[in-house]
Swiss-Prot record:
Gene that encodes the chain: hslV
Active site positions: 5
Annotated protein name in UniProt: ATP-dependent protease subunit HslV
UniProt keywords, alphabetically: Allosteric enzyme, Cytoplasm, Hydrolase, Metal-binding, Protease, Sodium, Stress response, Threonine protease
Intracellular or extracellular location(s): Cytoplasm
Keyword Cell membrane tagged: no
Entry's Gene Ontology molecular function annotations: metal ion binding; threonine-type endopeptidase activity
Amino acid sequence: MFEATTILGYRGEMGGKKFALIGGDGQVTLGNCVVKANATKIRSLYHNQVLSGFAGSTADAFSLFDMFERILESKKGDLFKSVVDFSKEWRKDKYLRRLEAMMIVLNLDHIFILSGMGDVLEAEDNKIAAIGSGGNYALSAARALDHFAHLEPRKLVEESLKIAGDLCIYTNTNIKILEL
């Protein structure tokens, strides 16, 4: 279900300034065939105050995006309240409970994973989250680079996704990054 991509979210503070970034590769795979190498799976929401990215079924992911964006607008960009309401609304709709997609949403203060089952997970360290087939590779690389290297945030996201792209056959190194 989550083959064909890697999405990495990273937030924190450097030099007294908060940052938030999301990056993703561009590969779309259908079975054992790459059908697109430069897809965009990340976007900014709510007047460029929230970043998001998806992994999984494209149609299901757009359903997730639409639903989350509507809730985010109604909560005037409050990410924490939006993810709570997202989960509540999700549990009420039997159709939504079967979506085969996941999302990462983040701003300067929070980072969450939203699942196609209606689960909302805050990143363990409230700093780094990854989803998709190469997510564990990207997460491991990002944690190591965050802990031991003093890289600029954009470089950390880029290098972590490159490592995932080198290891995961469903992830390429055609990387796109958005930042707040």
